[in-house]
């Protein structure tokens, strides 16, 4: 049996795991924490010799000792598939080869890496270590023709001692990497299958006597006033005889020395332990809200006082305890507002640079996120340093997932197999040792979706033996038999509420929810209401942070994103990897903006708006609101009536306080109170004045007495009637109706074509990812996407300066015997207004939800300048609207289109009182609904958006698709999660609604002023059901 198919052989010659740290020559240098400034740090990233092989045996024997001059090159770190070698494949949970534990395909893609590194004289007499922070999957190391060792565990640091193999001057380093190994069976995460040296490789030099490892711990007194810092240090002496040393240690608070002492006459023989502890009075406490860090600096000196090395460590005073079924951080109740984060770069795959990692964390902080789960494996060691600095609570997950066994009905197959215990336990042990000194880590997670069994229990006990200061999580320990937190994923709101009503003895979180695939997630507010209602639910992590699309460019220069199947890979899980709050290029999506608002730590509530009385609620757990300002603005239909700023003071953590706003005298217009809360100070992640949250409160409805629309340019209408059509002509317009469809086919205004495609009542939308289950289970089988419309009756009435066109149609799918009997009533007035009343009566049996009840038409493509009075500025839906407010907004059709990498319904604006689409000269169309509607406009047809699988497959139309929807199904998160809640569902049932279409010209009054008139002259009250008369 070879080494990569033997579960009892997890490594050879790999050093024991230990904390991640570096040695420096001075205290000043050490406190920079810049590893590249260390004289005994040598980065090996960059260009390497490389050759790709389909089989391990194809690698030539001379590879380990001879530089292959005719080979190509590859950048390290990189996934070799991203550099044009081998094949990418995306699966969510399935293994890409037959399950035959512990065996993997004999045709095992293999990368052979070589590079020369040069050691200066300064490395003589030193221990020389080589460290690999990430290699996928199995790799062997050779130096100067000598075998060093091998390792498994793709996302864990592997360290080897190569002191005996290196020399001053040039050295040949060779690494053979195989994509598949027995360890693949526990690395089946939801991501692209790829391989290579994808994190940094570097050399570390050590004096023969040095600090080998250390563990820092902080403990508070009962009053959480003073704290004890303790440190267990392991020192190593590689010399033949014992060495006497001094270990000095100093704790810095900025430039101030908090404590300084030493352990003198410390004799070191091989591995020797030492410890120190001291009290720190009233230390600043570390939390995600206030990530205050001290510097602990340890200096090791020889018997003559010469500095051997200086080792720094950032220290945060933080603890976590469980009490009364809740966990407490620094004796404070905390709720974790989190995300699940994979490593992914849209150009490099999992070879993620630290600039991108840092931007991720900055974006999280900007959007009120306070926790991150490293789904589902350890990150680059520097990730945790950044979390310490920026302030994020980390659930640090172990590199264990065997999800693929679920496909054969045995997800616990190896998790409950004692033969695999070493594999499982070793991974959590290596993980904890490496990252144990980070205050940001509050939870160790044993892995993900691997069933449950003896190996999980063994992992838990190993974790607790190493570190009893943190909580341990594993979601599939469903009864919380051993873990410290009970956890579920994708639990729906009603059951989540039930969990809150009947608390478990242990704290509860939901480690994955609100699947953020495509347009969504919806329903965040309803979830958050449950979380806030029940203290026992202390954490929630949206799935997931970032799309995993791979950027590509077509022949026309259009950027698009590849997903499963785009590389000819099969089986695959298609576009299931496009499920992030941010896009693959790190652009925030609408879902992230909604999440930011829903979890905002400063809440504003109305008490008595007539008196300007509000309430501010501080949902920070450690921090007052002294660094926040409230900005109030009273707006009336686009005009600011008053503004006010209030510096928030003396609002303690997790408390509330009254607020008083001075309201102006309001006129007849509809008015709102808009509140924005900003953070005053500049931070690492934001500028001063960074907005935290936005709220809107209605102050009054429009009470103006309606004035009928009566322009002075109206002329009598003429009606031209023939066998196929009828045309209504007025002062500056002509509208032609087809007698075959009952619809207008042409609308000319001042010589311009306004209408480009026949209008129609519409019950379908381009499928969004979160509606895929409804589409595949209901809509497609019932042919909703190909419903036909047939004219049953067409009538024309002319009287009193108006023409009525009445069309009665049936809209129904082929094959079935259900549908909607629809009535279109068009009132064309001499003044140019077109009043439209739409209604439908269902027949047959279809008791199910549908995407929408709406109306769509094609209009002149030049009318791309948009103004609307409704909810904005971003897209919004019934269950995803907290981040947007009602006002008058101006945009363009292009800007309102949310270009999802997998095209789908998008760009909706709710609660629209009126909208105008015009060209650059102000000519166009005004829409004034009888009651607020949903509105969207695209430069693409509905059919094209629905059929396209990638954004570059969208074919821009010459015209604009205008959608005026009565009801629109909420988003939900049912791509893998919760269905749309009952409140936001749309049913195939009787309906009635209406609106006015009015051509506008640049020289006429503005759309806003026109929209204030009353249209229809009693038409709507006669032709719409009572529900639409309000």
Swiss-Prot record:
SUPFAM superfamilies: (Trans)glycosidases (SSF51445), beta-Galactosidase/glucuronidase domain (SSF49303), Galactose mutarotase-like (SSF74650), Galactose-binding domain-like (SSF49785). One of its GO terms (molecular function) is beta-galactosidase activity. Changing residue 92 to N: Improve activity. GO terms for cellular component: beta-galactosidase complex. Its EC number is 3.2.1.23. Disulfide bonds: none annotated. Keywords: Glycosidase, Hydrolase. GO terms for biological process: lactose catabolic process. InterPro entries: B-gal_small/dom_5, Bact_Beta-galactosidase, Beta-gal/glucu_dom_sf, Gal_mutarotase_sf_dom, Galactose-bd-like_sf, GH-type_carb-bd, Glyco_hydro_2, Glyco_hydro_2_AS. The active site is at 449 (proton donor), 512 (nucleophile). It catalyses: Hydrolysis of terminal non-reducing beta-D-galactose residues in beta-D-galactosides. The wild-type enzyme is an ineffective lactase. Two classes of point mutations dramatically improve activity of the enzyme. Belongs to the glycosyl hydrolase 2 family. NCBIfam families: PRK10340.1. Heterooctamer of 4 alpha and 4 beta subunits. This is Evolved beta-galactosidase subunit alpha. The lineage of its organism: Bacteria, Pseudomonadati, Pseudomonadota, Gammaproteobacteria, Enterobacterales. The gene is ebgA.
